A protein has these predicted regions:
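Extracytoplasmic/periplasmic solute-binding protein
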Residues: 139-141, 148, 174-226, 272
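Extracytoplasmic "Venus flytrap"/periplasmic binding protein-like
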Residues: 62-127, 139-140, 155-161, 168, ...
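Hinge/lid segment of periplasmic solute-binding proteins
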Residues: 37, 101-151, 204, 208, ...
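Extracytoplasmic/periplasmic substrate-recognition and gating elements
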Residues: 61, 66, 160, 249, ...
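Short, solvent-exposed loop/beta-turn-alpha elements that line the ligand-binding surface or hinge
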Residues: 115-129, 192, 196-199, 214-239, ...
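Conserved C-terminal helix/tail region of periplasmic/extracytoplasmic solute-binding proteins
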Residues: 158, 182, 348-350, 365-369, ...
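A structural signal for short loop-to-beta-strand junctions that line the ligand-binding cleft
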Residues: 88, 95-96, 122-157, 188-190, ...
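Glycine-centered hinge/linker elements that transmit conformational signals in sensory
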Residues: 177-178, 223-257
Length: 439
């Protein structure tokens, strides 16, 4: 078996990631949803999530061992999925399984999407709301629900004289962060990890953080999409970004070169209290060889000074919808449908997605996730706190995100102004939406 990574997070490596078996194996008898071994096709999955590459390789290898069906998993570099997908789909041996981020992504790829209406995997969904539709056709299946917020080192926070209960609003967060900065040399740590703006990290701010002003504008206007964002809460976006970059492990001018690995390693080394990231980071922080246990960490909402902050939850949703390439051969389509059904219905698949990938999956056979951050989200929801919806799937294009990211980077470096960020956000949105409408 050949296992590898096309390009990992922040990497420029280029090698095939494949899981194949030399001979056909019998299907396991241990589960009623065991995979079949007589499929004639093959599976090529273009994976979106670098942090789960190893787990997908292992699961693909297990499926191949069990069924004899070749499964190739290729993982795009962080921030390069759309570019990689365009390149791979132009090849004769194109992915049989790929993903889109929601309605905007689907608009670009719907002509390649097999109608999953009535498929076995669609029948496993716990709610039809996780089916991505175009008219009556189901063209995508949401396969993971995730949360993001401020991952917090409770031990460091307590060393600074505070607890999680002291932070219930942006004003509270600002007070704590600025106090930590004032005593940074004495304490030996910063408030925030570096807000890296290179391609392996900038999505945290041009997409995930940018979701907050979009969400609150949509809430205020009673909408769920727009061709003309107004930027009502961009002052709040500025406030939280300023807090990040002025109370972190490095000078703001250094952020253009800071990576996702830099930010994670700073947190792992207890150099900062807060780390904006998501539930997908759990296995990078807790477990064998990692410095933290569940008792050391939690996740807090990203407060920006808008709305009922005392009852605000984590940012929870999905931008991960599986699509099956309808241009693939019938055998490959059937093999791909069998594979994804096995992933979400078999003991092996659901356990791997819960334990190894840290996923909460919206399927009937889902295993309970041991992920601390998933549990925190569940607890907040049970307490009546309102999750912040993932509205960034309505962002008009990747080009829009890149424009906002470039403006944020220049602003942090002191070579650009916040007005440039506003222009990229508001005018850029209108321009990209107009291009979409004309396409």
């Amino acid at each position: 078996m050949a296992l590898g990574l096309l390009a990992g997070c922040g990497s420029s490596a280029s090698s095939t990631a494949a899981s194949t078996a030399d001979s056909t194996a019998s299907a396991a008898d241990s589960t009623s949803t065991a995979a079949t071994s007589d499929a004639a096709g093959k599976v090529y999955y273009l994976n979106f999530k670098p942090e789960q590459d190893e787990a997908w390789q292992d699961l693909a290898a297990k499926y191949t061992e069990e069924t004899g069906v070749p499964v190739t998993v290729v993982t795009a570099a962080s921030g390069q999925y759309e570019t990689t997908l365009m390149s791979e789909m132009a090849k004769s041996d194109a992915p049989t399984l790929f993903q889109v981020n929601g309605p905007v992504g689907l608009a670009s790829w719907k002509d390649y999407c097999y109608d999953l209406s009535g498929s076995k995997i669609a029948g496993e969904l716990t709610s039809d709301s996780y089916a991505l539709k175009d008219g009556d056709a189901t063209l995508g299946i949401g396969y993971v629900i995730e949360s993001y917020g401020l991952i917090t080192n409770k031990t460091l926070l307590e060393k600074a004289g505070y607890s999680v209960d002291d932070i219930k609003s942006f004003a509270d967060l600002k007070k704590v962060a600025e106090d930590i900065t004032a005593r940074k040399d004495e304490l030996g740590f910063a408030a925030f990890t570096s807000a890296g703006m290179d391609g392996s990290s900038d999505w945290r701010f041009k997409t995930h953080l940018a979701n907050l002003p979009i969400y609150f504008e949509y809430q205020a206007d009673g909408i769920n999409n727009t061709d003309a964002i107004k930027g009502t809460y961009l002052d709040n976006y500025k406030d939280i970004f300023d807090l990040y970059i002025n109370n972190s492990t490095c000078d703001p001018a250094e952020l253009a070169g800071k990576t996702g690995d830099d930010s994670r390693n700073e947190f792992l080394n207890s150099e900062a209290v807060f780390f904006q990231n998501g539930s997908w980071e759990y296995n990078n922080l807790v477990g064998d060889g990692k410095p933290f246990t569940d008792d050391d960490l939690t996740m807090m909402p990203i407060y920006v000074g808008v709305g009922d902050e005392a009852n605000q939850g984590l940012c929870t949703g999905t931008e991960n919808y599986w699509c099956v390439n309808k241009e693939a051969s019938e055998d490959d389509i059937n093999a791909t449908l069998d594979f994804i059904y096995w992933c979400v219905s078999s003991d092996e698949g659901t356990k791997a997605m819960a334990d190894d990938m840290g996923f909460v999956i919206p399927f009937k056979a889902a295993a309970e996730s041991p992920n601390l951050f998933v549990k925190v989200d569940n607890e907040m929801t049970a307490e009546g706190k309102t999750p912040v919806a993932w509205n960034f799937s309505t962002m008009p294009s990747e080009n829009w995100k890149n424009g906002v990211g470039s403006a944020l980077t220049a602003y942090a470096a002191g070579t650009g102004s916040w007005d440039d960020v506003v222009t990229a956000f508001v005018d850029g949105w209108a321009s990209e939406a107009a291009l979409n409408a004309a396409a």
